[in-house]
């Protein structure tokens, strides 16, 4: 893990390969990504070897099989390294480019004292038992706020991932997307779906959030161990339209929590919406391509 309270196992790799890095002004330079190498690495044999076989489990609710509505836009982040394990969770968020994920900042950037942005990340939506039903998606660019990149400020532990097209399609065209909130509340009935790094399938729990602080939310449900960082907190989910609103992602205080039964999230306020606008506009930091 990245630290005592981290929900993610991060290895920041200093490998320079071609990608366009999209960063916030003042943010640490992004680490480039190699889409061809990453795709070649994740063949089916490696996916099956990454984790032991088993079945998904649902906390305090009904099981959601692969491809179920609640988990449709959620996937595991894998890093191109020898360990072969997924390390975080991410989900599709609506954007004009139809190519955007939301996750925890600490999943994609080491923050203060770290090595900057992660390299060779791939996203596998609906991952289960070594299967990638919607393909393996490579990363175009990563984005976190400078308050995270420079100071590891827990109130800015949210990041965005822009994906490359896959087979001529964008991720939102394939899976749909949830949206960001327009209000700034503390209490929401949410579905939280994520990938523990010791399992080969997601877990899901439904519960009501509460206020941890003026800038943080809290969610109580068991089983959210390492690997669940970045898991979306989805409210107002419609099984008919298969859409909902993301009001949080596991991260923030204690990088999401140091106990698997209590999780935290940054409250998705103006700072996150500003970061989102920079992600969808393709703005870059001074000196970046």
Name each model feature, range by range:
Residues 2-3, 26-95, 278-289:
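Protease-domain processing segments flanking chymotrypsin-fold serine proteases, especially trypsin-like
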Residues 103:
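Cytochrome P450 catalytic-core helices
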Residues 139-140, 154-227:
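Chymotrypsin/trypsin-fold serine protease catalytic domain
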Residues 223-249:
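Catalytic nucleophile loop of clan PA
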């Amino acid at each position: 893990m990245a630290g005592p309270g981290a929900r993610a196992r991060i290895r920041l790799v200093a490998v320079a390969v071609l990608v366009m890095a999209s960063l916030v002004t003042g943010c640490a330079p992004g680490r480039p990504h190699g889409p061809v190498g990453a795709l070649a690495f994740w063949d089916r044999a490696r996916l099956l070897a990454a984790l032991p076989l088993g079945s998904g489990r649902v906390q305090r609710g009904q099981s959601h099989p692969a491809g179920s509505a609640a988990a449709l836009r959620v996937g595991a982040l894998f890093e191109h390294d020898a360990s072969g394990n997924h390390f975080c969770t991410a989900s599709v968020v609506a954007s004009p480019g139809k190519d955007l994920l939301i996750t925890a900042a600490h999943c994609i950037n080491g923050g203060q004292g770290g090595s900057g942005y992660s390299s060779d990340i791939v996203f596998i939506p609906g991952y289960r038992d070594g299967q990638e039903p919607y393909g393996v998606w490579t990363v175009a660019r990563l984005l976190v706020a400078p308050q995270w990149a420079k100071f590891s400020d827990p109130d800015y532990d949210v990041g965005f991932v822009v994906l490359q097209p896959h087979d001529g399609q964008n991720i939102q065209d394939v899976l749909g997307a949830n949206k960001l909130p327009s209000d700034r509340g503390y209490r929401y009935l949410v579905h939280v779906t994520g990938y523990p790094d010791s399992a080969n399938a997601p877990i899901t729990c439904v519960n009501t959030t509460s206020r941890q602080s003026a800038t943080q939310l809290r969610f109580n449900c068991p089983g959210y161990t390492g690997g669940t960082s970045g898991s979306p907190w989805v409210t107002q989910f419609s099984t008919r339209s298969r859409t909902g609103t993301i009001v949080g992602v596991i991260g923030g205080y204690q990088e999401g929590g140091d106990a698997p039964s209590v999780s935290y999230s940054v409250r998705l306020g103006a700072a996150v919406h500003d970061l989102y606008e920079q992600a969808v506009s393709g703005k870059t930091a001074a000196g970046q391509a």
